[in-house]
């Protein structure tokens, strides 16, 4: 489906079911080669590239994602994947700041309420995604200050 109107932002981390952290390109390869999808399932990613963190692009914002099938959220949300395992540690501050900025921009662009920034685990309760140590409440607070 082309032309979604996002009402939610869903935050993920890149921890696999086998306990490994994979990078953006490995996720894209898996989604395209193993799953047979046309692109990575997320709309954006945040990963360390060299000495700095960067926002990486995935699917176009108006394309249906493949990141949260529960409650048909793929059809009404943008998916952002933070590369890392946040069951063990908080995201690095520079990566978290990029996520805050990205969420602010998307909330403004699509008039998404801050309370609609959700963790993947909110829909897939059998997961911890985006991690036990991921500061979802802090993310909401930081975005709310600047939206």
Task: Give short role names for the model-derived ranges.
Residues 35:
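Aromatic-lined glycan-binding groove of carbohydrate-active enzymes
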Residues 24-31:
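Short Gly/aromatic-enriched secondary-structure transition segments
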Residues 21:
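Substrate-binding surface in catalytic domains of secreted glycosidases
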Residues 38-45:
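Glycine- and aromatic-enriched membrane insertion/assembly motifs of diderm outer-membrane
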Residues 1-14, 18, 46-64, 68-147:
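Basic/polar, cationic surfaces and motifs that engage anionic cell-wall
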Residues 31-32, 107:
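Hydrophobic alpha-helix position signal
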